[in-house]
C-alpha cells in the first residue's frame, strides 16, 4: 500500500498538527498523539489552508495501528 520510506517517515514525524492521508483518499490532521492514543480530526479549508475541526474521524492505540488502517503523513 505505502512505501517503507513513507511508513518510517510517518513513525518518526507524525505528531500533533501533522496532515495525514488515508489510503482511500481521505485527509485528516493529528489532534493528539500520546503514549497510548492517537486522535485524527477532520479538516476544512479556510483561505486555502487546511484547518482542524473538532470532529474526530479516527482513534488508535498506537502509530502501527494507525498505519495498518491506511493513514500516513501527507
How would you label these PLM feature ranges?
Residues 1-74:
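Terminus-proximal functional modules
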